[in-house]
């Protein structure tokens, strides 16, 4: 049995269309939407709305850790859009829908997918075709092994939770939930052979992004589940340039499957 696993697709529909080649199934761990490509400032929703020059300026400010200036730039640009009478929510949703139409059409059959923190779960049923199974806090058998899926990201002190979306520097983050909600989904999955999540367990070397130079949120509940239920694999993404791509915890191989938008190459799981 051969399963290909991708995460952090961020608009890379071209490589996604070939990601299932030679595999019996594809697993996607979310973050389909591309809001802003740090490597190519012309790609994504932000440059489509505000131009590549403004996108480049925003990336430069964030990379230099001048976050307040980055937020001010975002507020100014969004404020100008608001001044035209156009709803920013409708503009963003329209752009996300266009990306989803292209990305979901690229999924092979069968595909098993869960949400990332930049995805909009309520839209997925409109685009998921019969060969795509969406799971969140649920489990499924693939080739005789049980896979559990938990989607979404966690709120942080600087990224407060909201009912519909939250904004950090005026960037929409639609699927961020509380620690308690996340832990409940982990518990609902129970004992599995392969535990598939968007975010990593709360292990420093798995959570630290060496390019962004910051720790992303990992899940303590996920780490506890790995230690107590001992799945064969814990597969995740979210951190694009982690300090460590894999760590062994007891008998569990914990693997960041890679930043698919940049690599175009799936992680391969065989048994």
Predicted regions and their residues:
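Charged helix-capping and loop-helix junction motifs
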Residues: 97-98, 131-132, 211-222
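Proline-aspartate-enriched helix->loop->beta-strand connector
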Residues: 25, 192, 219-236
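Core catalytic region of metal-dependent phosphoesterases/phosphodiesterases
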Residues: 6, 11-142, 257
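Short hydrophobic patches on amphipathic alpha-helices
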Residues: 20, 104, 186-187, 226
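Binuclear metal-dependent phosphoesterase catalytic core
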Residues: 139-144, 160, 223-228, 241-271
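Active-site-proximal loop/helix segment associated with metal-binding centers of metalloenzymes
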Residues: 36-43, 47-86, 145-212
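Extreme N-terminal starter segment of soluble prokaryotic enzymes
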Residues: 1-4
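Active-site environment of divalent metal-dependent phosphoester hydrolases
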Residues: 10-15, 33-37, 114-124, 155-160, ...
């Amino acid at each position: 049995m051969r399963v290909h696993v991708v995460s952090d697709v961020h608009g890379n529909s071209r490589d996604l269309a070939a990601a299932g080649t030679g595999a019996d199934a594809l697993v996607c761990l979310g973050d389909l939407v591309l809001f802003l490509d740090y490597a190519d400032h012309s790609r994504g929703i932000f440059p489509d709305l505000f131009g590549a020059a403004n996108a480049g300026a925003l990336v430069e400010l964030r990379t230099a850790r001048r976050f307040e200036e980055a937020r001010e730039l975002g507020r100014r640009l969004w404020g100008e859009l608001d001044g035209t009478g156009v709803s920013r929510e409708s503009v963003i949703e329209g752009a996300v829908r266009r990306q989803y139409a292209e990305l979901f059409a690229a999924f092979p059959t069968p595909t098993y997918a869960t949400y990332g923190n930049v995805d909009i779960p309520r839209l997925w049923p409109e685009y998921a075709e019969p060969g795509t199974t969406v799971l969140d806090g649920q489990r499924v058998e693939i080739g005789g092994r049980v896979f559990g899926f938990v989607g979404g990201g966690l709120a942080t002190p600087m990224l407060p939770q909201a009912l519909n979306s939250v904004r950090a520097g005026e960037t929409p983050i639609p699927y961020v939930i509380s620690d308690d909600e996340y832990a409940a989904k982990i518990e609902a999955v129970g004992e599995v052979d392969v535990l598939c999540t968007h975010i990593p367990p709360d292990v420093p070397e798995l959570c630290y992004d060496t390019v962004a130079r910051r720790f992303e949120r990992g899940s303590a509940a996920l780490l506890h589940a790995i230690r107590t239920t001992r799945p064969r694999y814990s597969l995740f993404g979210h951190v694009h340039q982690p300090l460590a791509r894999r760590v062994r915890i007891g008998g569990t191989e914990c693997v960041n499957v890679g930043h698919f938008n940049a690599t175009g190459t799936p992680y391969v799981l065989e048994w």
